Amino acid sequence: MADVKKIATRESYGNTLKELAAEGHDDLVVLDADLAAATKTGMFRKVHPDRHFDCGIAEGNMMGVAAGLSTMGYVPFVSSFAMFAAGRAFEQVRNSIGYPHLNVKIGATHGGISVGEDGASHQCCEDFALMRSIPGMTVICPADDVEARAAVRAAYAMEGPVYLRFGRLAVPVFHDADNYHFEIGKGEQITEGNDIAIIATGLMVNEARIAAEQLAAEGIHARVINIHTIKPLDEEIILKAAKECGKVITAEEHNVIGGLCEAVCAVLSEKLPTPVRRVGVQDVFGCSGPAWDLLAKYGLDAATICKTAHEMLNK
């Protein structure tokens, strides 16, 4: 594939918050936990310091503050690393935001193994599982800059709690901003193919694209499906792919337990039993190292997707 621009989706998050405010959305407020430089909400703070609230390293309290602001008519985007937003503050997210179904948007950056050198303590590979278990919570993991920007806008426009996962790592931008339509709960078919389906989310979507190109050179035609919304899940696109391809690979930068794979398997087991193989973090903790090296170490790459496809097709 030709070289393309790379942007971290956390940058997309910060830029879009700033753009929304500039467009006159005066109900938009942003909260952070002493991490505005890392989550990129500092972009918003520079132009609207009166609408940016730094709650310090007290993520649970920050979720409560966001809940309170939402009851007063504001639309809070509450920001921290995924490990702290989904992990440390889970009780407050569940009880203060999820239970009353408040209009709070959680912008969780630094998700997954690709946090890199920060190591296992900061590499949150359990956030999908935690957040999708909360009734009424929408869970989104965009694949690139274009999709991330669209996801932030869609989250702002909808009513109800939303969890958005963004990455630290700069990843290829493969969507065309002028010809891209984002809809919460609707997956996107990226490539044609009926030999095998690769259902991916987040940065694994581009790895699936690369894998599909490599497989095509061997005469294997893989259908790549981008599931940016993990909840609510687009069952229709999954069932169609499973029916027409007969074999499915899921790919996610998350523990294979509790995330996209289990969501897909739940649909297929009930409605269309289909062979499925899981590409993801295999129920282990991460370690410290350069992001791309870690993705390769844990099998979160195109090479592993291709290997898995060969194993399924040759079985």
Positions of PLM-derived features:
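Thiamine diphosphate
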Residues: M1-R165, A170, H181, ...
